[in-house]
Regions:
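Alpha/beta enzyme core
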Residues: 20-34, 78-81, 124-137
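Conserved, mostly hydrophobic/aromatic
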Residues: 17, 24, 35, 79, ...
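Structural motif
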Residues: 27, 58, 82, 107, ...
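Conserved anion-binding
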Residues: 16, 74-75, 85-170
Length: 217
């Protein structure tokens, strides 16, 4: 199973963003991961619409957007028009998550949910038929550089085991995604990995060297 390696662009150097995008694409990454935060659902602010539009227009690889915001349904059409390929919502923020996931698909975009560490499989299982991707948070959302929460490993196993019963979604991980965790989780069937400071950014090696090493794990 080929891994999906997805650099978290919140960790990139925005003073040379075009160069970052080009280097990451040359390294062989699969999807650009773009974080949007509203300062309400999470106590931080993420990338702006102009940043996302620029990355989507500049990149030749797909882009996803992770909406850590209240009332995500209000913004689905806006992000779809910017050119994103995948939209993740947090069901914890949306009382009509089923409708919002269908809106995403109707907009011609792949749909996903991001599941907080404290949210169980049972809580979201009725949404899974409408998901192309399920991204499990292994840290509390909103900040880079946190430590992996060990108790979520069992939840990864549950979501992987149930995938075929709910339409065959791909399982992703976001948060503290180190090479050691990538190796462990890929063995149990996790497909995609959001790469931040734990695995990709701020290292002494080139992006290509790191991506090649992660592919080999």
């Amino acid at each position: 199973m080929k891994k999906l390696l997805c650099p978290s662009m919140m960790c990139a150097d925005f003073s040379s963003l075009k160069y970052e995008i080009e280097n990451l694409e040359k390294s062989g990454i699969d999807i650009f991961h773009l974080d949007v935060m509203d300062g309400s659902f999470v106590p931080n602010f993420g990338m702006g619409l102009q940043d996302i539009e620029y990355i989507c227009k500049t990149a030749t690889k797909p882009c996803d957007v992770h909406l850590m915001i209240e009332n995500p349904s209000k913004y689905i059409d806006k992000f779809a028009k910017l050119g994103v390929n995948i939209i993740y919502i947090h069901p914890e923020t949306d009382p009509h998550a089923c409708r919002t996931l269908q809106m995403i698909r109707d907009a011609g975009v792949k749909s996903g949910i991001a599941v907080n560490p404290g949210t169980s499989f049972e809580t979201v299982k009725n949404l899974l038929y409408l998901c192309d991707y399920v991204m499990l948070m292994s840290v509390n959302p909103g900040f880079a550089g946190q430590k992996y929460l060990d108790f979520v490993t069992e939840k990864f196993e549950k979501f992987v085991d149930e995938a075929e019963n709910y339409g065959g979604y791909d399982v992703m991980i976001d948060g503290a995604c180190s090479p050691e965790k990538i190796q462990m989780l890929s063995k149990i069937g996790v497909k995609g990995f959001i790469l931040g400071t734990s695995a990709l950014f701020g290292k002494d090696k080139s992006y290509k060297e790191i991506i090649d090493e992660l592919r080999g794990l």
